[in-house]
Amino acid sequence: MCSLGLFPPPPPRGQVTLYEHNNELVTGSSYESPPPDFRGQWINLPVLQLTKDPLKTPGRLDHGTRTAFIHHREQVWKRCINIWRDVGLFGVLNEIANSEEEVFEWVKTASGWALALCRWASSLHGSLFPHLSLRSEDLIAEFAQVTNWSSCCLRVFAWHPHTNKFAVALLDDSVRVYNASSTIVPSLKHRLQRNVASLAWKPLSASVLAVACQSCILIWTLDPTSLSTRPSSGCAQVLSHPGHTPVTSLAWAPSGGRLLSASPVDAAIRVWDVSTETCVPLPWFRGGGVTNLLWSPDGSKILATTPSAVFRVWEAQMWTCERWPTLSGRCQTGCWSPDGSRLLFTVLGEPLIYSLSFPERCGEGKGCVGGAKSATIVADLSETTIQTPDGEERLGGEAHSMVWDPSGERLAVLMKGKPRVQDGKPVILLFRTRNSPVFELLPCGIIQGEPGAQPQLITFHPSFNKGALLSVGWSTGRIAHIPLYFVNAQFPRFSPVLGRAQEPPAGGGGSIHDLPLFTETSPTSAPWDPLPGPPPVLPHSPHSHL
């Protein structure tokens, strides 16, 4: 089991991490191009330094037309109709109970009793699921994979799956699209685009971007040849469903055929047919909502986390699921191996990384998830003291988010900061991983930014063929792209010494997406038996749920 005591010391203060070479992280005094041996392999990406000053905080005022008219007293039934549309049942009962005329006394009394009963039921439901009492903004901030979502200028970052293009959601609710081959930066704005929580590019499409907003989902269709920097709102398609707000997570199927959405207040995952603007629910009756969705790269499974101490894994053939309860808290973050045979996840309140394997392969038309009985602990991130050139430094704690690169050889973990501890800022841990023939997790190093900068989001480039490319959003507004140069263990394609890409094996393609899927040796015991071996296990037992 890997622990923080095995990590090399962090870089000296004032140094920033530039790239990885020979399994070591190279630092410098500032963000600069790699040495001459590497400059030929450097990809052309825009350098972003976004500050909070020019970004206006999104307004929270009501921009409706109600305040433009002179107030006059309406009849009670008209007021109830308007309140039903704006507030719902609670507002109607409150209006009738507090009306002074036009209502019989027994109607007022009955409405008062019904209002008290509804409030009691609401408080009971809120005690079971405390997150339902939060405002929409607080809900998004609570379950966002970015640290300090409420006040950071970089809220969401999403790479395009096939090209050097990415989208960034900013504090002012605008979304900017950057392309390495173009100087034009479209800025997407819409009156419904508020509190953006997730961005998702449609696979196998050059121009379709899904945006998760407070009240809906916007599907932007951008013309790659357009010279406009402000696409009109007519380029956006609106998807919405009652009770499915705020939307906190989006996930396209790897084939691009389906779009999944999740909301912490809706117990059902919504599967959207974008062309007809209709959705089909994937319901369950426990968990109080869905916070995050993550489709496995092979398209066979979907991880669905909840606000409660349970998470589910769905299979995408017959749409059945299995559930794994956790011991202390909800699933905080997770990531899939490239072949979908392994899930790494963390639990809120625990400084541990768990591994859950899926050795069973189901045939065509058979609905089964095939997960192991229990999860094993593969890394202990408990706080420890590390000797540095500047003295002792405490490192460790809980993980906030975690990403696995498409080659399956690098894992980045964004650790939570501790405001009460001196220098208790968030840090990024980098691991070397191997998923076949046996799973390995080894320390690589600690990624550091400019003085005073704290990491807020991390993600890997989906198709970087020279190793891995880690993109980091910092609290200063800078988006840094850190290349991790290494030779792929299964299909060596890049040699930093030669400075050129090597040819893949016969029959293999030049892209990661064209390579055969990794495989794992499955045990000879029953499918539900835990994998053999001495690692400690915790009882995360699945229970079938259709």
From Swiss-Prot:
Record key words, sorted: Acetylation, Cytoplasm, Cytoskeleton, Disease variant, mRNA transport, Nuclear pore complex, Nucleus, Phosphoprotein, Protein transport, Repeat, Translocation, Transport, WD repeat
InterPro entries noted in UniProt: Aladin, WD40/YVTN_repeat-like_dom_sf, WD40_repeat_CS, WD40_rpt
Biased composition (Pro residues): 529-539
Entry-linked PROSITE patterns: WD_REPEATS_1, WD_REPEATS_2, WD_REPEATS_REGION
Tissue-by-tissue expression: Widely expressed. Particularly abundant in cerebellum, corpus callosum, adrenal gland, pituitary gland, gastrointestinal structures and fetal lung.
Pfam annotation, one family: Beta-prop_Aladin
Gene3D superfamilies noted in UniProt: YVTN repeat-like/Quinoprotein amine dehydrogenase (2.130.10.10)
Main localization (coarse): nucleus
GO CC entries: centrosome; cytosol; membrane; mitotic spindle; nuclear envelope; nuclear membrane; nuclear pore; nucleoplasm
Region (Disordered): 500-546
Ranges for the WD repeats: 142-180, 183-222, 234-274, 280-316, 324-380, 386-433, 442-482
Residue ranges of the motif Microbody targeting signal: 544-546
Recorded coiled-coil stretches: none
Modification Phosphoserine occurs at: S33, S495, S511, S522, S525, S541
GO-annotated biological processes: fertilization; glutathione metabolic process; learning; microtubule bundle formation; mitotic spindle assembly; mRNA transport; multicellular organism growth; nucleocytoplasmic transport
Function, as annotated: Plays a role in the normal development of the peripheral and central nervous system. Required for the correct localization of aurora kinase AURKA and the microtubule minus end-binding protein NUMA1 as well as a subset of AURKA targets which ensures proper spindle formation and timely chromosome alignment.
Disease: Achalasia-addisonianism-alacrima syndrome: An autosomal recessive disorder characterized by adreno-corticotropic hormone (ACTH)-resistant adrenal failure, achalasia of the esophageal cardia and alacrima. The syndrome is associated with variable and progressive neurological impairment involving the central, peripheral, and autonomic nervous system. Other features such as palmoplantar hyperkeratosis, short stature, facial dysmorphy and osteoporosis may also be present.
Name of this chain's protein: Aladin
Organism per entry: Homo sapiens (Human)
Designated gene of the protein: AAAS
